[in-house]
Amino acid sequence: DGTPTPLGEETVVVRISDHGELGMSHGGLRQKAFNVYEESIRVPMIFSNPLLFPRGGSSPHPASLLDLLPTLASLLDVEPPPGLRGTDLSPLLRDPGAGPVQESVMFTFDDMHAGTGKVREVVPAAGRIRCIRESRFKYARYFHAEGSFPAEAEMYDLAEDPHELENLAHPGHPRFGDPEVAAQRERLMARLAEAEDRLARPLPN
């Protein structure tokens, strides 16, 4: 009935989702896989507790589902296990107006059948995706470990192009050779490579 209880005051409730839905965006795409568009990878992450967070708020800064465990450990004053991946988001929960606790998050996708031709009716797409997402920019590379699918890349300026219609990583884009765009692209490629070395461990083929 909505009446506060001691259990409610002692419980942190987290509402999340594992993926979004394309909903016919980007020219009629459906489902949620084989892409890094915001409709697919941007999901809610809501923390609720009347004592810890008496006032509502939201933050635009990057966060990942990997951050869930270290954040809960911090809120509960529990020492996280060594080597735990993810970032503590509790500073943002306590002060939504605070600056970012991390500059970017990485998204990965692995499908063991796409592009192999070994399974009937499989999606003819890259089996692996690696993406770096910052507050403003997003860069992704699509590839297949066995080289059966041509490598492709996407880059979007989410401030100027929130619907992700202008792929600045496509050689045919009129701004592809723009020095500022090229510099951002090289920076994002380097950041993604560093994140892959640090975080991503591909599944075996």
Where do the protein language model's features map onto the residues?
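Short, solvent-exposed turn/loop segments enriched in Gly/Ser/Thr/Pro and often Arg
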Residues: S17-G20, L29, R85, L199-N205
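Short glycine-enriched, charge-decorated loop/helix-capping segments at active-site entrances
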Residues: R30-K32, S59, H170-R175
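Histidine-centered active-site microenvironments of extracellular/periplasmic hydrolases
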Residues: D1-R55, S64, R120
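C-terminal, low-complexity/hydrophilic appendages and adjacent surface loops
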Residues: N35-I41, S48, F109-H170
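Long, internal low-complexity/basic segments
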Residues: L168-N205
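Polar, surface-exposed loop/tail segments
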Residues: T3-V14, R55-R130, A183-R187, P204-N205
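Phosphate-coordinating loops and pocket residues in cytosolic domains that bind phosphorylated ligands
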Residues: S25, P91, N167-H170
